[in-house]
């Protein structure tokens, strides 16, 4: 009887410790996000490291740690964390958006384009995704693809004057002055 009582006590003690671990990782996530909000990026990275060591299968702490690293301009580390988050959950668009930004800062535009393509598969009307992909194509001097992206954006947001000026920039780079001037005229019609 005494031995079974010890087994029950041990069972309840282990159960309560594992329940506290659950509460602590949730709390660490909250503390890490709060530190991120208050721009204490080093502290937030520490908090997310604790969550990752306790629950490495979650994607969220990798994303937030990557976001903190991005703000600290550790683009390589942020890209790796976004990749780890994508490995764990490939259906969250923020992971692709952040990894694309990291790759732009690392001047790896082709890889950034592939991230934005995946982002736009998940969220087809993501304005920042379309815009950043267009900028990548401009950096790669693939002006036809940039114009194609801008035309898609204009299909979603036809009254955005900056899109026409961006289109004019692509046309000027192609030395198509007439098309560039037509785009600028359209931008001025929308926003004089």
Each predicted region: which residue ranges?
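Helix-start (N-cap) detector for alpha-helical repeat units in TPR-like alpha-solenoids
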Residues: 24-26, 59-60, 93-94, 127-128, ...
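Register position in tetratricopeptide repeats
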Residues: 37-38, 71, 105, 139-140, ...
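N-terminal leader/linker segments that initiate helical-solenoid repeat arrays
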Residues: 19-64, 71
